[in-house]
């Protein structure tokens, strides 16, 4: 029999992230209406709340998953303190990444957290080398550090193969040594 394990502890954090990729079947997989109905429970924690982090194609525009969520949240007076986003680049274009972040900030008028980012080709996971990942990490970090509305960012993933995709994006290898990406951070 499974035991109850609370996901929120008194850890000293003042922030709580919303649902992870609710627009994706293999992630939290929920409708906007389901997320809106659960949101008051997150608000009741008293923590600063990050929006649900949608996949990139469902982040921008009024008709996107996040656009509909934010419209309904605002109409109901629900609190969303910052917008959490994911960004996976297939072309190493940091200028496009910056434009995406600026568009998110312009549309939602809130601070932005990039809670997952890396180079990724889901059809060919090993397409990008560790050196390419490291360079994207370096240039992307510099770019985000220059954007005053980006409060946090978290690279994907912590250790190579830990994501199940083998994107050459891990910060640590299987022995716990820093990879080229890890040395950037």
Predicted regions and their residues:
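Aromatic/hydrophobic pocket-lining residues that form the small-molecule binding cavity
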Residues: 31, 35, 97, 133, ...
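Short acidic, gly/pro-rich beta-turn/loop elements at beta-sheet edges
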Residues: 59-61, 93, 163
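Active-site clefts of carbohydrate-active enzymes
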Residues: 24, 50-56, 107-137, 155-172
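Substrate-binding cleft of extracellular glycoside hydrolase catalytic domains
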Residues: 1-81, 88, 125-131
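A structural motif corresponding to the C-terminal end of an alpha-helix
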Residues: 42-47, 76-79, 107-108, 142-150
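Aromatic-rich peripheral "rim/lid" segments of glycoside hydrolase catalytic domains that contact
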Residues: 7-8, 99, 143-185
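Non-transmembrane alpha-helical segments in soluble domains
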Residues: 39-43, 70, 105, 141, ...
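Aromatic- and acid-rich polysaccharide-binding/catalytic face
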Residues: 14, 20, 66-122, 151, ...
